[in-house]
Amino acid sequence: HGTCSRIMEVLSPTRIKCKFMQDMSEGMEWGRPDETIGFIEHKTMRTVATGKMNKFEALNKAEFIIELSVPLPAGVEAGYVIENLTCTPDAEIRNCHFGSCRARGLLVSTPGKVIIENNVFESSGSAILIAGDANAWYESGAVKDVLIRNNDFRYPCNSSIYQFCEAVISIDPEIPTPEQKYPYHRNIRIMDNTFHLFDYPILFARSVNGLTFSSNTLIRDTTYQPYHYRKEGITLEACKSVVISNNK
């Protein structure tokens, strides 16, 4: 995932003072000339405009100034957050074994192309978390193209409650005011996987446009007793264009 930073002050039409809001991000070079910036309204997590960066100037380990190539888009002001849209990698994760993982097997939040295929998951929290927020951890990355296919999700998955572990696959961006008209994530396909489930929550999804859950095999496992407060197999919040089909 990337890192969101907050606009603290608009110094001029082309200069903004920003701050790393999470101390584990402090000290990094947030961006470089000609890279693309997304401007995000933090309550809805909607990217309202984009721009180009001319210069990055660190003031200290937490604060920095960004000079823009053109004036700040209308309406963007102090309190908005910025995301570097250039530094967003693709990810191919194949033939891996995720075992003895404390919180999650994978945390994936990038607009790049993501393929998660032919893996075995035995994590104690969610096997896969797709997150994104600009309010707590400030982890950026609204996904645009994610394929989760032919993986084996075994019974330890989601056997303990950790932060954001709402289901075996948890799509859980932190959005104070979700807007169904403008979903945060899009184009997520979960297909041809096998789930060995001792508990009920299989999939939790918030703020997704274009979600497919199809041709998956669901096997009841009795190794542990169900404990999760969610009793539904699939929970959807502020989603649209959802297909759930041919699961068995």
What is each PLM-predicted segment?
Residues 2, 32, 88, 93, ...:
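Parallel beta-helix/beta-solenoid
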Residues 118-157, 218-243:
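Long amphipathic alpha-helical scaffold regions
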Residues 1, 102-109, 124-131, 153, ...:
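Short glycine/acidic-rich loop motifs that flank beta-strands on beta-rich extracellular proteins
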Residues 24-44, 72-93, 190:
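Extended Gly/Ser/Thr-rich low-complexity repeat segments
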Residues 57-80:
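Long, low-complexity, polar/charged, intrinsically disordered or flexibly structured peripheral segments
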Residues 1-11, 19-59:
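Ser/Thr/Gly-rich low-complexity blocks that favor extended beta-strand/coil architectures
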Residues 17-26, 66-72:
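A structural micro-motif recognizing beta-strand termini
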